[in-house]
Amino acid sequence: MQSYNVFPALVIITTLVVPFMAAAALLFIIERDPS
């Protein structure tokens, strides 16, 4: 039953990381914009 705790942890990590990566990509694109 220990391995069952891995899935919720992955869901939480994904939920936290995905918006951060999206924001970082947005900032990177905005910074690269010559305008």
From Swiss-Prot:
One GO term of the biological process aspect: photosynthesis
Q: Which residues cross the membrane?
A: 10-30
Superkingdom of this protein's organism = Bacteria
Q: Which UniProt keywords apply?
A: Cell inner membrane, Cell membrane, Membrane, Photosynthesis, Photosystem I, Transmembrane, Transmembrane helix
Q: Where in the cell is it found?
A: Cell inner membrane
Alphabetical GO CC annotations of the entry are: photosystem I; plasma membrane
Topology relative to the membrane, per the entry?
Answer: Single-pass membrane protein
Q: How does it assemble?
A: The G.violaceus PSI reaction center is composed of one copy each of PsaA,B,C,D,E,F,L,M and Z, and forms trimeric complexes.
Q: What is this protein called?
A: Photosystem I reaction center subunit Z
What's the name of its gene? psaZ
